[in-house]
Amino acid sequence: MSAVSESVLSLSRYYLPVYRPCQVVLVRGQGSRVWDEQGRDYLDLAAGIAVCCLGHCDPDLVAALVEQAGRLWHTSNVFYSEPSLRLAQELVDVSRFAERVFLCSSGTEANEAAIKLVRKWAAAQGRLPEHRTIVTFRGSFHGRTLGAVTATAQPKYQEGYEPLPGGFRYVDFNHIEALEAAMVGGDVAAVMLEPIQGEGGVMPIAPGYLAQVRALCDRYGALLVLDEIQCGMGRTGTLFAYWQEEVVPDIVTLAKGLGGGFPIGAMLAGPKVAEVMQFGAHGTTFGGNPMAAAVARVALRKLASVEIAANVQRQSVALRAGLEEISEAFGGVFTQVRGRGLMLGAVLAPLYAGQASAILEVAAEHGVLLLQAGPDVLRFVPALNVSDEELADGLVRLRAALGDYVSRCRG
């Protein structure tokens, strides 16, 4: 490690230690490559946790940001600004269901807004507080704020934050009988789920399950809330993951890829709930600021293109095939590769169970950046415009990294 790296990393003692970053100081990015301060390049198959959907420093996004930065940075929502209004209209138009949009700055804020909207809607229906329950699924991840982390049905994210807010109920993912049992009492106001669970191990929804959930929501008078913060904006091969199921939701939340790397979140509200929240019912200081909205408008246009959809589908096949070939080359490192589009998870074989974090470190040593989704799953969420050459290079580096790791394990 260079003296510069050591000097910069020494500053980490001033940062609340809630992260455990790879010991690399990144200083520049272009496309699906990033560089550290020593000039070493890395193939980025993590994309800032599925955020940099158009790669690093996409020229069109940079141009939009620079242009808006020279005009107007921030107004708050006390005043109108054109970029946020235009973005809201474009999200409504492209969503195929929404009537109104709430803009914020992150995914957890979008989910908090959705939770509050569900509760407001239930109250407007005359439902008592005990009849405003929200059902979520084990393995889910909806954010870190107190409401969102309570919706997140994973105890490891909740421990130590008790007492948690009430009014949530958890069921097993992809089990329709369990869901109906949780709803039959008539106290459920909404069902909230990710079409693909990201932090929960890259677990895709079972074919036909979302339609069954929609039917139960209709039967028991509940809203359907879809968290597409990670799986939306083209990542699964269609702009919205729910399009593949031909289901109409009531609320959809977005963030991550929507800004292409610039912080933004959005909650899309359908006709049942679009008019429920009126003046003063909710708000944000930074949400929908002109710079974020200007960048997101360009990102949305590009992510909705047929070119991006085609590339996601093609590279998904290549990435899946590459991972399966690498696994076979080393005696079955992975038991399966699951997911959709460019949101794939490689499940570690029992011999390597619990070692995802260690593998990530070795991968970085070999110049490829990955994520994990729990201790047993390597997560791959590259830029949606990743090129053939970039992906091939990433797979070469990953093969070398896994070969190195397997050799170390075998002594």
From Swiss-Prot:
Ligand binding (N(2)-acetyl-L-ornithine): R144, T284
CDD domains membership: OAT_like
Designated name of the protein: Acetylornithine aminotransferase
Cofactor(s) named in the record: pyridoxal 5'-phosphate
Main location: cytoplasm
UniProt GO BP: L-arginine biosynthetic process
Additional notes on this entry: May also have succinyldiaminopimelate aminotransferase activity, thus carrying out the corresponding step in lysine biosynthesis.
GO molecular function, one term: pyridoxal phosphate binding
Modified residues (N6-(pyridoxal phosphate)lysine): K256
Superkingdom in the source lineage: Bacteria
Provenance organism: Xylella fastidiosa (strain Temecula1 / ATCC 700964)
Catalytic activity from the UniProt record: N(2)-acetyl-L-ornithine + 2-oxoglutarate = N-acetyl-L-glutamate 5-semialdehyde + L-glutamate
Disulfide bonds: none
One GO cellular component, as annotated: cytoplasm
Keywords: Amino-acid biosynthesis, Aminotransferase, Arginine biosynthesis, Cytoplasm, Pyridoxal phosphate, Transferase
Family: Belongs to the class-III pyridoxal-phosphate-dependent aminotransferase family. ArgD subfamily.
Cofactor note: Binds 1 pyridoxal phosphate per subunit.
Pathway(s) where this gene product acts: Amino-acid biosynthesis; L-arginine biosynthesis; N(2)-acetyl-L-ornithine from L-glutamate: step 4/4
